[in-house]
Regions:
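Phosphate/nucleotide-binding beta-alpha loop and adjacent structural elements of enzyme active sites
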Residues: 1-260
């Protein structure tokens, strides 16, 4: 029942997979990162759209149940799962695991956990649908920066990096600064989440971070399900490297810059 509810909710979430594949249509080999993969919906959707392209997928999550959820996906060739948190340091951090509404709010950040309206409303939904009275639990997990992960695994270029980490966006960017500045990622799909009263400050800071590093925001969509009955707001943003925008493979695509 929980998994069915997750897929129903996910169906109404913003979808960027077709846009991403259209951008990369001339690429024959792809390296894709799915950070905060949970049940692997993003990776599975991309796989269906890839046709005959060669690929390598690197999936990341720190929910101990995820490996079970994506067991069939991991049977495929060139799919690599990493039970580690992407952050701004290499070491350990505390993970807030949402047991009552597992597919949302679990993060190194306490942003969602601390939003009383979000927690109360989702607990009510969970209790009605699943008879679930669980809470958040906290436990230590391993962390690594994107810069270190690429260096350690000798990855020179990433075609797509999807990031869904429920409030830890600053930490991700701090740990990926070298990678982004050196133009090692063509496309970044980043969920930006924050409190409604300070969201646009965070949003503008992140958009400006990418602008300074020569990335263009070409598409964005608000996640209405996050804002409903909460003090939170979330927007999915699709950034593309300016270098790749100017390349031959992107020349005939008609995307406009999004006003920040």
């Amino acid at each position: 029942m929980k998994s069915i509810f997750y897929y129903i909710v996910n169906f109404v979430y913003p979808s960027f997979e077709k846009s991403i594949i259209r951008i990369l249509k001339n690429e024959k080999k792809l390296v894709i990162f799915d950070i905060g993969c949970y049940r692997g919906v993003f990776s599975k959707t991309i796989l269906k759209l890839l046709s005959k392209k060669k690929y390598k997928f690197y999936l990341f999550d720190i929910n101990k149940n995820v490996k079970k959820y994506i067991a069939n996906l991991l049977k495929l060739k060139n799919i690599y799962y990493n039970e580690v948190a992407i952050s701004n340091k290499n070491g350990k951090a505390n993970y807030n695991h949402n047991l009552f509404f597992e597919f949302a709010g679990s993060s190194l950040s306490s942003l969602v956990k601390n939003d009383i309206k979000w927690v109360t409303s989702r607990k009510l939904i969970s209790k009605i649908l699943f008879l679930n009275n669980e809470e958040f639990i906290k436990y230590p997990v391993s962390t690594i920066t994107i810069d270190k992960f690429l260096e350690k695994n000798k990855i020179k270029l990433v075609d797509v990096m999807k990031v869904d980490i429920d409030g830890s966006e600053y930490e991700f960017l701090q740990g990926a600064k070298k990678t982004i500045e050196n133009d090692k990622v063509k496309i970044i799909l980043l969920e930006i989440m924050g409190n409604k009263n300070s969201f646009y400050d965070k949003y503008k800071k992140i958009v400006n971070f990418f602008k300074k590093r020569k990335y263009t925001l070409i598409k964005k969509k608000k996640q209405w399900s996050v804002s409903l009955f909460s003090n939170l707001m979330a927007v999915d943003c699709l950034f593309v490297s300016n270098k790749y925008l100017k390349s031959q493979s992107f020349r005939n695509l008609h995307y406009n810059r999004v006003n920040s």
